[in-house]
């Protein structure tokens, strides 16, 4: 009989343990949502569910939400706390007027909650796709997380306004890009501003040229991370590191200037290829164990430009900043040298977006002709992409780096349907992707120009636009840019231009006829045209089918022979293999799950009761 009791106890405890473990989640990712680290989150996920643990410096309520824009309106919110020793959690949403409503469908499940003298901790989970119109679907794209807290719990009278205890942070919850650690004591050098005076305005982009340290032999950079001056965590919004022309004048080194200013030195314009990108809240980028960025050889970067975006909405004066980047490097060489290929739309005034458009699509082609010639010559077996940076400016809303082989579309290299200009980092790929000679790539960008009165032009300023994907790959080949640009003639024909003044002696060039555009530059003519959303849509459809000019350039000023060729956009077909969000389930299926759980619980209790009577 004692053996039967022991057997029953083992069965019961094993069943209980298994049912408990199935609900457990390992929090492998974490982030501080504010600069003072008062609000911290951890999370983990599987193919259908995400689980959060939040720790906040308060004994009152805490709010956590997912927003389409980073603002309060139209957000998916959960509010909870610990009141009189009992944790609570409620699912809310806000309407377009920011009014808070309790969600009829409570899709967030409270797992546990506790508090001490200073902090509140809550853990909760939800499905990635809840099938609730008031909840946001969580995907691999950028997620704008909003947060708030208050010193008091939610009482009978409802929520108390949180005041200034609030904020937002963009994260990639399903693609956080956790990298491997590097050995302690790894050597490093810093690229750091020296007491730069931050102007008395809300937004400033500061550029400075640096020279990499001279190396007697080849080394590999294995990690790059931000150096943010203490107290400036909310001031320094993002940092970009560009490779410059290796023939840059040495007198430019350590010279700083406001970026994109009319008086910015021309030499700064040679710094185009992004080597690294960091955005507020990020923790840097670590190269895979078999790859590093080569420095110290004749073909490696020598001069670089550091671009820092200062965000000063309160217009504080008298600020000086010494932020920058730290690059860790090692003489222990890895198997492969990393390279960067810039793909997308060639930055030019020929890239133009009509005003007033809620969804305008631009496509930049890295053509099969360019990849065929360059990779056949340098690496016939292809190159492996391990990280991607998707890049646009303020009008950008979504970007996808599409991949084709023999005109058949494969899975995208990277995609972000909720692009945030202020959150740009290299996204490590979960699996490396092979690019073969003859493959082709399309960087597809979606823009919103609603509220703009004139054309938006391709250019360097943040009010101008870009559509680029920077691919980190190995082994390095001599291919720096693989881009395209739609021909201008077809774009001008749309607004009725029939002739330009020749010879062309000015830029932008001047229109000759018809009379209504005579002696206007082509940019002035485009602005003069009476755009409507319908006309903008027709223009978009035409531009995407126009012949395009191919850019296929090597490092420096050299070019592959394909550069300048005029080709038509390829006819491609989709394989329909894109990863879909978790499908909504019928209520009956959910009820069945609950019934099964209740049945399992009843069985366990029956086993226990039987054991007690043996």
Swiss-Prot record:
Source organism, top-level taxon: Eukaryota
GO cellular component: endoplasmic reticulum membrane; extracellular space; secretory granule membrane
Signal sequence bounds: 1-22
Sites carrying sugar chains: 116, 249, 454, 519
SMART domains in UniProt: DoH
Keyword Amino-acid biosynthesis listed: no
One GO MF term attached to the UniProt entry: copper ion binding
Active site: 205, 391
Cofactor: binding comment: Binds 2 copper ions per subunit.
Residue intervals on the Lumenal side: 23-593
Residues the record lists as binding Cu cation A: 237-238, 309
Keywords assigned by UniProt, alphabetized: Copper, Disulfide bond, Endoplasmic reticulum, Glycoprotein, Membrane, Metal-binding, Monooxygenase, Oxidoreductase, Signal, Transmembrane, Transmembrane helix
Membrane-related topology note: Single-pass type I membrane protein
Family matches, as Gene3D superfamilies: 2.60.120.230, Copper type II, ascorbate-dependent monooxygenase, N-terminal domain
Residues passing through the membrane, by range: 594-612
Top-rank EC class of the record's enzyme: oxidoreductase
Disulfide bonding pattern of the chain: 207-259, 244-271, 366-482, 370-552, 445-467
EC number(s) stated in the UniProt entry for this protein: 1.14.17.-
Keyword Secreted on entry: no
Residue ranges of every copy of the DOMON domain listed in the record: 37-150
One record GO biological process: dopamine catabolic process
Family: Belongs to the copper type II ascorbate-dependent monooxygenase family.
Name of the protein described by the UniProt record: DBH-like monooxygenase protein 1 homolog
Natural source organism: Danio rerio (Zebrafish)
Lineage: Eukaryota, Metazoa, Chordata, Craniata, Vertebrata
Primary gene name: moxd1
């Amino acid at each position: 009989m004692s053996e039967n009791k022991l057997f029953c106890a083992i069965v019961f405890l094993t069943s209980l343990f298994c049912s408990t473990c199935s609900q457990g989640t390992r929090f492998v990712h974490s982030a501080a949502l504010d600069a003072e680290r008062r609000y911290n989150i951890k999370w983990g996920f599987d193919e259908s569910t995400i689980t959060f643990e939040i720790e906040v410096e308060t004994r009152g309520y805490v709010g956590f939400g997912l927003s389409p824009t980073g603002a309060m309106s139209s957000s998916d919110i959960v509010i909870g706390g610990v009141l009189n020793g009992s944790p609570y959690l409620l699912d809310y949403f806000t309407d377009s007027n920011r009014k808070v409503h309790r969600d009829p469908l409570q899709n967030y499940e409270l797992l546990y909650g506790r508090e001490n003298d200073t902090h509140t901790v809550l853990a909760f989970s939800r499905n990635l796709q809840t099938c609730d119109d008031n909840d946001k679907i969580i995907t691999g794209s950028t997620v704008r997380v909003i947060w708030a807290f208050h010193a008091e719990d939610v009482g009978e009278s409802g929520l108390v306004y949180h005041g200034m205890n609030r904020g937002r942070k963009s994260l990639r919850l399903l693609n956080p890009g956790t990298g491997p650690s590097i050995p302690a004591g790894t050597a490093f050098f810093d690229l750091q501003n020296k007491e730069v005076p931050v102007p008395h305005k809300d937004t400033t982009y500061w550029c400075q040229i640096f020279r990499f340290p001279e190396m007697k032999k080849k080394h590999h950079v294995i990690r790059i991370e931000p150096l943010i001056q203490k107290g400036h965590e909310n001031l320094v919004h993002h940092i970009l590191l560009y490779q410059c022309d290796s023939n840059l004048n040495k007198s430019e080194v350590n010279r700083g200037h406001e970026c994109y200013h009319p008086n910015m030195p021309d030499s700064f314009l040679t710094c185009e290829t992004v080597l690294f990108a960091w955005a507020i809240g990020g923790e840097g980028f670590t190269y895979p164990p078999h790859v590093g960025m080569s420095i110290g050889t004749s073909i490696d970067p020598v001069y670089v430009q550091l671009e820092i975006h200062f965000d000063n909405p309160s217009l504080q004066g008298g600020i000086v900043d010494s932020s920058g980047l730290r690059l860790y490097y090692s003489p222990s060489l890895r198997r492969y040298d990393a390279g960067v290929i810039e793909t997308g739309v060639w930055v030019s005034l020929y890239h133009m977006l009509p005003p007033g458009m809620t969804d305008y699509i631009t496509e930049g082609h890295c053509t099969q002709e360019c990849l065929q010639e360059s990779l056949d010559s340098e690496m016939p077996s292809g190159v492996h992409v391990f990280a991607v940076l998707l890049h646009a400016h303020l009008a950008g809303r979504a970007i996808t780096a599409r991949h084709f082989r023999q005109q058949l579309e494969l899975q995208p290299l990277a995609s972000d349907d909720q692009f945030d200009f202020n959150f740009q980092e290299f996204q490590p790929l979960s699996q490396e992707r092979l690019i073969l000679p003859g493959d082709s790539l399309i960087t597809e960008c979606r823009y919103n120009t609603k509220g703009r009165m004139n054309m938006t032009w391709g250019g360097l300023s943040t009010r101008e636009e870009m559509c680029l994907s920077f691919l980190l790959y190995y082994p390095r080949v001599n291919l720096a840019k693989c881009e395209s640009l739609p021909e201008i003639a077809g774009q001008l024909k749309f607004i009725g231009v029939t002739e330009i003044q020749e010879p062309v002696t000015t830029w932008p060039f001047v229109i000759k006829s018809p009379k209504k555009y005579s002696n206007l530059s082509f940019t002035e003519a485009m602005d003069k045209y009476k755009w409507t959303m319908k006309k903008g849509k027709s223009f978009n459809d035409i531009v995407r089918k126009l012949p395009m000019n191919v850019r296929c350039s090597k490092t420096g000023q050299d070019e592959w022979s394909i550069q300048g060729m005029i080709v038509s956009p390829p006819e491609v077909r989709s394989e329909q293999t894109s990863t879909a969000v978790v499908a909504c389930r019928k209520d009956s299926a959910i009820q069945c799950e609950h019934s099964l759980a209740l049945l399992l619980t009843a069985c366990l209790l029956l086993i226990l009761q039987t054991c007690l009577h043996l």
